[in-house]
Amino acid sequence: MKAFSPLAVLISALLLQGCVAAAVVGTAAVGTKAATDPRSVGTQVDDGTLELRVSSALSKDEQIKKETRINVTAYQGKVLLVGQSPNSELSARAKQIAMGVEGTTEVYNEIRQGQPIGLGTASNDTWITTKVRSQLLTSDQVKSSNVKVTTENGEVFLLGLVTEREGKAAADIASRVSGVKRVTTAFTYIK
């Protein structure tokens, strides 16, 4: 039988404690997000699955895979396509493919003509999304958990289940964040 040094056992125990803490925090964050989202947990799972299925369907088209950059976001069965395509034909084909995926009820095709953005722009988009989410979180005009934010090449896209007043407020808040070039909304309005 192999003997373990006391130092190795101690280090392993400490590392495992860190893993447990990270797992607990991660699980709590996911649980909180699921609980505050106005969609049912089932709908949230369906939307996540739909995003994967649409992305997979798009990647099966070799020309789309090689020549475009397309990100997929789903909210209550509505699919948002953002990114870049060298021509409108590929953009239209991407929309057609997305519509053919089971579970898709509507497609918002916001793919822009142009060359795919680079890593620097994509990183900046992530930063813009973080800033928009932070502003929505601190606003008393919008329930931030009702709004899904994605950014592509400085353009912010907002989806969600909101009142008209919340939708206008969310768009206004996003438009005031530095680095935002344009705000596009695709809300489902509730009374």
UniProtKB/Swiss-Prot annotation:
PROSITE patterns with a match to the protein in the record: BON, PROKAR_LIPOPROTEIN
InterPro entries cross-referenced by the UniProt entry: BON_dom (IPR007055), Lipoprotein_DolP (IPR051686), Transpt-assoc_nodulatn_dom_bac (IPR014004)
Domain BON: 46-115, 124-191
Disruption phenotype: Disruption of the gene results in a defective outer membrane barrier with elevated sensitivity to a range of compounds. Mutant shows attenuated virulence in an oral infection model and during the early stages of systemic infection. Loss of the gene does not have a global effect on outer membrane proteins, lipopolysaccharide or lipoprotein production, and does not impact adhesion, invasion or intracellular survival.
Chief place where the protein resides: membrane
Lipidation (S-diacylglycerol cysteine): C19
Location in or out of the cell: Cell outer membrane
Residue positions bearing lipid (N-palmitoyl cysteine): C19
Function: Plays an important role in maintaining outer membrane integrity. Contributes to virulence.
Protein name per its UniProtKB record: Outer membrane lipoprotein DolP
Originating organism: Salmonella typhimurium (strain LT2 / SGSC1412 / ATCC 700720)
The encoding gene: dolP
